[in-house]
Amino acid sequence: MSLLIIPKEEKKKEEPSEVLIDTSTAEKPEDVAREFIACYLVGYDIIRLRFRQRATEYRAYIKDIIRRKLVGVETIEESATHMATHCLLGHVEFPVKDALTRMHVLAQSMHKDAMMALKNGDFSLAKDVAQRDDEVDRLYFFVIRQLKMAVQNRFMIEEIGLLTSRDCLGYRLIAKSIERIADHAARIGQVTPTLKYPIIDNIIVSISEMSNTSIRVCQEAMKSVYQLNIKQANQAIAKTSKVTKLEKETIEQILLAKLNVRTVIGLRLILESIRRTAEYGADIAEIAINLAKKGKFS
């Protein structure tokens, strides 16, 4: 076994990294967007684009992606055939743990509002919840970018708020789980307007109980991450069985209520999303246990 010591003074201020995307081989704007996001995630500071055809269409699409999906990216140059962007927000200003906390708060708020929209038949609120998913995606991409850069540059580990490089995979999985929780909240928002109201009160009450339990799983899971608390993580995981039990009971209520087919299908999708939310919370709790053990090992 060997020990590698990296002196602090070796750290040097690096020049911004650049990459050029030539759009001439792209068949559609989505192809360019995927390449642009890949460059962002890898950690390039300046991303340049060269347009040869359909420049106006491609430029508008990339600007929309930047606005909706990416944190800290600004356009610094623009012409008829070229465009350059710079990622201005650094890891020191917005550490990974802060970004994860913000993601969790947004995802939890989306879920609660989606349930309120379901309860009240508020289609406007349901639509708003679905649209908020972009904000969670923006933070998710930012976290992945920071973690990828930290793996490549060990000087960044402490700067982004982590202890060791071994934490990077765990936090990446946590970010993905939170992003999926937000996706399921958005799906509830999308499904709600397809339901036929009124819906029997006892069904709404049962769905709400299942939702509240699911949210508690996620809350306790995130607390276990922040505190590296194995006992709390196990408590969160244990609660998922109650969510599964409530789902089965609520499905029975729905089938007995003789609702129209479209509403039955929609409610089943909503129940599935609530259950999946709890399962992603349990995944986060399991990662918290791993991080706690790694912390003791290191």
Q: Can you name each region flagged by the protein language model?
A:
Residues M1-S298:
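Cytosolic, long alpha-helical scaffolding segments
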